[in-house]
Amino acid sequence: MKAVLTKEVGGPETLVVEQIDAPAPAKGEVLVDVAACAINFPDTLMIRDLYQFKPERPYSPGGEISGTIAAVGEGVDGWQVGDRVLAGIGSGGLREKVIVEAHRLFKVPQGIDLVEASALLMTYGTMIHALKDRGDIKPGETVLVLGAAGGVGLASIELAKAYGAKVVA
């Protein structure tokens, strides 16, 4: 299978595409045929060794993926071949097939585009945590969004409005 790999510290120009062996799921894991892999700011830092997590090279960047389950490992309940999923995996997403621990999977409903689904976890998850868990946002409050053009900024606008807040962006 094809994989985008980082073998040396540097920017996107240092990434290479190579053939690697396809993995097989172990106990508690599934194999996902990757439909899309979201690239986020931490991915750009990781390939430059500027992030707190530094996977051993060579590795594939890409921390969140969507796709279809291709194989299910022993002991995995609730998932089957053909299920549409998304997952936050930390790194390794820029491959044709990815091993994912079953507890990291989220089901993608029919009618939701897998490319769009791949970009939900980090951006929307970050803002749900910020607005609800940390900020305890209430209807009628005002949210100021500085930097509304990126994924997290756009998610903050949409979510703040959904929570009933007034948004200034």
What is the meaning of each model-derived region?
Residues 3, 34, 98, 127, ...:
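Terminal peptide-recognition signature
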Residues 21-38, 50-92:
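Glycine-rich beta-strand-centered segment in the early N-terminal region that forms part
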Residues 89-102:
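A structural motif shared across PLP-dependent enzymes of the aminotransferase-like
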Residues 120, 124-169:
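Mid-domain Rossmann-like dinucleotide-binding core that forms the NAD(H)/NADP(H) cofactor-binding site
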